[in-house]
């Protein structure tokens, strides 16, 4: 829809459903930030997210019915699937902890995916097309869908880590607890170096940070749990991809650009989990590692695809 032809949009229900989901998320976005400033989660935001997820579900089912194959074979379909997975992950996380910070952190990701798919991609990349012979395999659903869901979980978890950094900004908070955020010993370090456990009588500037401690710990725990799920799914996705590659091309690993960046992504999040489980890190330092992972996923998924390089690329600049 590079030229944004309104007639072609209204005649194509798949594109129309995507735009409807975009409109709902766009409506929810300012509401998310208002809820953060108000300090309370909003049932209206969750309702809009739920409706957008239902619209994306209907869009994917309709494209599946139209094309006759699982709708994840081109960049438009994979972006819509990623938006669906991001909104679903966000809803599941908010069910665990209904905080406005979750919606404010994660909603822009789903919105950005749909916006890029609907307004930036050329028309030929938005249309359903027959699968190439190598993709006509039952591994398509197993490998690609698991990888995309892992990306969604890792993206949402990393965005929650960014929220940890934003919450702790300028307050020098350091969280000390178990890897799942329970039984925490939390301390604040003042500019002069004074340290106090939360809840213990201390200087006024330390007492004022108790709410931020609780918020940071919740965000940090949710980020850790979400990233753990995403990491496990990414591991399964990489292994299933290796098996599929061996069947299709006779090689378990070919150092294709997407494979290489997927490995880099796996190593970054493995380092994140290592720092938490083995080193006992929590709070800002692992959040910085997760933020690096956010950049790596964007390069792995969008950067490689748009350059049209390798067997995994959907193409754009060089072969569109």
Swiss-Prot record:
Transmembrane regions: 14-34, 68-88, 101-121, 146-166, 226-246, 260-277, 289-309
- UniProt record, GO biological process: cytochrome complex assembly
Give one Pfam hit by family name. Cytochrom_C_asm
Q: Which GO terms describe its molecular function?
A: heme binding; heme transmembrane transporter activity
Q: Which GO CC annotations does the UniProt entry carry?
A: plasma membrane-derived thylakoid membrane
Keywords linked to the UniProt accession: Cytochrome c-type biogenesis, Membrane, Thylakoid, Transmembrane, Transmembrane helix
* Record bears the keyword Cell wall biogenesis/degradation: no
Q: Which top-rank group of organisms is this from?
A: Bacteria
Membrane topology of the entry: Multi-pass membrane protein
- InterPro entries documented for this protein: Cyt_c_assembly, Cyt_c_biogenesis_CcmC, Cyt_c_biogenesis_CcsA, Cyt_c_biogenesis_CcsA/CcmC
Primary subcellular site in the record, as a coarse category: membrane
Where is this chain's protein located in or outside the cell? Cellular thylakoid membrane
Q: Which family does it belong to?
A: Belongs to the CcmF/CycK/Ccl1/NrfE/CcsA family.
Q: Subunit comment for this entry?
A: May interact with ccs1.
Q: Quote the function comment for this protein.
A: Required during biogenesis of c-type cytochromes (cytochrome c6 and cytochrome f) at the step of heme attachment.
This chain belongs to the protein called: Cytochrome c biogenesis protein CcsA
Q: Which organism is it from?
A: Synechococcus sp. (strain WH7803)
- Which taxonomic lineage does the organism of this UniProt entry have? Bacteria, Bacillati, Cyanobacteriota, Cyanophyceae, Synechococcales
């Amino acid at each position: 829809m590079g030229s944004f032809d309104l007639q072609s949009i209204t005649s194509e229900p798949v594109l129309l459903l995507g735009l409807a989901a975009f409109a709902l998320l766009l409506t929810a976005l300012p509401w998310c930030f208002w809820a953060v400033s108000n300090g309370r989660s909003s049932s209206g935001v969750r309702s809009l997210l739920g409706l957008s997820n239902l619209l994306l579900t209907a869009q994917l089912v309709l494209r599946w019915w139209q094309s006759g194959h699982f709708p994840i074979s081109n960049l438009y379909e994979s972006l819509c699937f990623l938006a669906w997975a991001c909104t679903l992950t966000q809803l599941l996380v908010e069910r665990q902890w209904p905080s406005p910070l979750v919606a404010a952190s994660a909603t822009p990701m789903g919105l950005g995916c749909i916006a890029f798919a609907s307004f930036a991609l050329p028309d030929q990349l938005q249309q359903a097309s027959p699968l190439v012979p190598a993709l006509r395999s039952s591994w398509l659903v197993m490998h690609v869908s698991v990888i995309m869901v892992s990306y969604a979980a890792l993206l949402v978890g990393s965005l929650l880590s960014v929220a940890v950094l934003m919450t702790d900004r300028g307050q020098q908070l350091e969280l000390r607890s178990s890897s799942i955020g329970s039984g925490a010993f939390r301390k604040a370090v003042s500019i002069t170096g004074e340290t106090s456990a939360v809840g213990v009588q201390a200087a006024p500037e330390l007492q004022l940070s108790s709410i931020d401690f609780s918020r940071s710990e919740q965000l940090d725990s949710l980020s850790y749990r979400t990233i753990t799920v995403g990491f496990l799914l990414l591991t399964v996705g990489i292994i299933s991809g290796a098996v599929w590659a061996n069947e299709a091309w006779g090689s378990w690993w070919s150092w294709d650009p997407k494979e290489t960046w997927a490995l880099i992504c796996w190593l970054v999040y493995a380092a994140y989990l290592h720092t938490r489980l083995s080193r006992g890190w929590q709070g800002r330092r692992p959040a910085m590692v997760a933020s690096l992972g956010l950049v790596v996923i964007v390069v792995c998924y969008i950067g490689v695809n748009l350059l049209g390089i390798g067997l995994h690329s959907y193409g754009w600049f060089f072969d569109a």
